[in-house]
Every structure is written in structure tokens, then in C-alpha cells.
Amino acid sequence: MGNCCRSPAAAAREDVKTSHFPASTGGGKKKPHQARNGGGGGGGGGGGGWEKKRLSVLGEEGSEVNGGIEEKYALDRELGRGEFGVTYLCMDRCSRELLACKSISKRKLRTPVDVEDVRREVAIMRHLPRSASIVSLREACEDDGAVHLVMELCEGGELFDRIVARGHYTERAAAAVTRTIVEVVQLCHRHGVIHRDLKPENFLFANKKENSPLKAIDFGLSIFFKPGEKFSEIVGSPYYMAPEVLKRNYGPEIDIWSAGVILYILLCGVPPFWAETEQGVAQAILRGNIDFKREPWPNVSDNAKDLVRQMLQPDPKLRLTAKQVLEHTWLQNAKKAPNVPLGDIVKSRLKQFSRMNRFKRRALRVIADHLSAEEVEDIKDMFKVMDTDNDGIVSYEELKSGIAKFGSHLAESEVQMLIEAVDTNGRGALDYGEFLAVSLHLQRMANGEHLRRAFLFFDKDGNGYIEPEELQEALVEDGATDIMEVVKDILQEVDTDKDGKISYEEFVAMMKTGTDWRKASRHYSRGRFNSLSIRLIKDGSVKLGNE
């Protein structure tokens, strides 16, 4: 149902202390949710018709607030936005406690399934026992326009964003995070709940401290289950989806698979199964080949790799349970796990935008040159706003101050990568072309057609491969001087089958490395999943109910 209580709350806390919130109901801002229902109190049959047919979502799971949510809570700035709802910083008018309020517009609950999802989310959050690792629900209520879930405020940001900022964790830190995630899974399973949407974005840190508690959020896709019960509905996020979900025959074991995917990402910075298309991702999951050859895996302990393998066991009957994961040698000896920052390798991939990324940047420039004016209009406007002295480049300082103006549109991870791209630019600034290339990389604007066109640009002889000479030629055009060394580094990183040249698949993999897979992991609709499932059945990748 979308993330709650995202990190801008930390800044908001100071604003609250300086009287952003009204002291009384009458002084508050307009009630945003009442206005959304389209049947306001202004008159005519429209309003009356809505009242007669008013949708009651929560039933016994919640309470009515006839005067609107702001009778009890003062709403402030927006903290996050999901498919169905918006999360606001809010304050309890009586206790003055700062909380998060996820408001789900009733207009977006178009089907009985949507309504049931919200009702079940509340029921599950009430059903699960209090835990330091699960965000607590304070109140669930509804008014004419929306359902409101008031919960504790988490100010430390997403696990997702910390992974991006660091590149990846040390083994010791990854073990601590994995333990928390699997303890949440164990608690859910013991109480008859499958989470069904475990991913880094659905874990928030309570505060900004390094040792902050990690909390699970968003039970919007969770479901109650009984021992032996199987489900067929395809839900979740593609990169974290277990193979039996795609086969439409699954149980609680899927949460262990998703936790295994998160562990893999914590250790190396990218997911184990990914491809250019949704169907490609699904087929990679069904194949189940896990890459432990690429850096930094040679430096990861055998115990860590063993746990990843057992959590990503394709057969759910053989996959570890939550209890078995917690008893695994690697987690049992977590305090002895290597504390060496493995992240230097992956973080440097994200940070540099040089060496391998010099080639990638060249490819992005090729793509940018062929984009329509409409496709780059927003990026061009952003560049103009940030280039305050109109000198045609965005300096480090201009970028930092400009980010604040666009803060609501850029995730922390994107901000971090933009700044780091400038740091390693050489001149400490971005011209428009470089800014456009970085933005393309961050916003995942390069689709299959764009990538194919860029590949053909480099594959001068049309033999289906980018060979060292062609790579050399491309880098000469881009002004590189240490060409032979750069070509060697690029091939070392991109040429995964070590045949001395870059195939289209390897080129696409290079272009996808970075933030794009994270963008793609956000909520996918049931309709798209059903279409994907049909395609997989038609091409023979999946046989229904086949484990």
C-alpha cells in the first residue's frame, strides 16, 4: 500500500517545534481528504448521493471520525506516497506526540479486492504482537474521503536507501540486518501471517543512528494462512518473488526466499535475479542460477554464501524455515563475521561514473542524443533551475542547493548518486549532456529500444559484439587518454563470460547495474502480474501448480 513514515520527518520535527501545527482544530489546514471524494458538502444531489452510498472500509477494524481526521490529529507535510495513499507527518492534538498518518483515498479503492486489502492490513497489524521490529499501529479510522492509519513515526529512512548510500554492508552488519528481517518473518509465521512483500523498501530505521532499530512496515499485501494452505494470487515485487509465486502455488516459504534476496543485495549491492524485462526477471528466477563469481563474492565468507543458497533454494520443501535460518552458523557467529567493508568495490561502481562508467556514460549520451524533446523536457527544466549563474554547468554547490528545491521528487539515494557523480567528474561540475546522462541513469528512462540503438552505435561491424577495438574507438571520441587501461577495466567488469568482447546481454547488464533495478522493484499491479503469468504459461516457462 505504499511506504509510511519516510525520512523527511527528521527535518519536519524541527518545524513542528516551531509551531507548524495549529494549537486548535480551527487553526489547521484544510482537510485534504474530505475534498478528494468528489461529493463535497456544497450541495446538489452529488453530495447527498455519496452520503447514501458512503463506502465503509474498516467495519469492526476501525472507528469513524465524522468531523474528519484533523479533529484528532494535526496533519503537516507529506512524507511519502504510494499507489493508494499518502503518508503525512502528524501530531496527536492531545498528547502532542509526533506520528505518521497513512491516508488511503477511498476513490482509489475501486474493487472489493482493494477494500479487502486495506481491511486485512489493519486486521493483521492489530493481530501481530507488539515487537520492536514492527512499526506499531496506533489507530485506524475513516472519514468520508479516506481511511487513515496512524502509526509510530520512523525517522531513519529506508533500509533501501542505506544500501544505496553504502554500496553494500560488511558481513557483520548484513548479519545483524538479516537477523532482524528473519525474526520478523518468524513472528509473522508463528501467528499465521505471510508478509508476501518483503523488500528493502519495506523496512525503516527508527532513527538516523548507525545502530538504529530496524522496523518492518507495510502489511498491505500480507495474508492470514493456516498450516498446509496454498495460495495462487501473484503479488509482491518482481525481484523478490519466489519461483512458486510465479507457479501460483505457494505458502509461507516465500518470505524466506524474499529475505534471501535481501541478504544477497546486502552483500553485493544488486539482486540475484534481474533482466531487462519483467518476463526476463521471472525467467531468471525460475532458472535459479545465483552468481557468486562477480566481485565482491570471492571475498565473502563461505558460510554467508551457504546461507544465501539455502534461503534461495528453488524447492520450497527444501528451503530453510525462519527458525533454521536463525540457527545457521553464519548468523549464530554474526559477531565473528568479517567486519571488513566489502562495500568498497560495489560502492565504487555507484560512485565513480568513470572507468566502466565512462563507457556507460558514453552510451547514455548516445541514448540522450536520440531522445525526443518531450522525453527530456523535465530534466532540461531542472538543469536550468540548478544552473543559477547561467554558465551552462551545474557546480557541486549549485547541485546541493538545487536538490533542496526538487527534494520532493528525488529519493535520498538519487541525491547521493548525483553528488557522487559530480565528485568524480574531474571538473567538479556537470554540463547539460552529463547531467542528462546521469539523470537517464537514475530515472531508468533507457528502455529496450534505446539500449539496442546504443549497442548498434558501438557495434560498428554489426557482428553482434562490441570488440576491444570498437570500445577503444568509442572512448577516443569521448576524450579518454588512458584508453588501454580503461578498456581493460571495462572488459574485466562487463565481459562476464570472459570471451574478450561484449555481447548485447552483457551490455544491457552493464546499463542496468546501478539504481535501475531498485526503481523497478516498486509496487507492481495485479493486472501486470496476471499478464506476466499468462505470458510465462504460454511460453512454457511455468506450469501451474508445479513445484
UniProtKB/Swiss-Prot annotation:
SMART domains cross-referenced by the UniProt entry: EFh, S_TKc
Gene source species: Oryza sativa subsp. japonica
Record family assignment: Belongs to the protein kinase superfamily. Ser/Thr protein kinase family. CDPK subfamily.
Gene name for this UniProt entry: CPK16
Phylogenetic classification of the source organism: Eukaryota, Viridiplantae, Streptophyta, Embryophyta, Tracheophyta
Keyword Membrane annotated: yes
Localization, UniProt: Membrane
Chain positions recorded as Ca(2+) 2 binding sites: 423, 425, 434
Amino-acid positions noted as binding Ca(2+) 3 in the UniProt annotation, renumbered to this chain: 459, 461, 463, 465, 470
Name assigned to this protein: Calcium-dependent protein kinase 16
Keyword Membrane included in the entry's annotation: yes
Listed PANTHER family: SERINE/THREONINE-PROTEIN KINASE
Region of interest: Disordered: 1-53
Membrane topology: Lipid-anchor
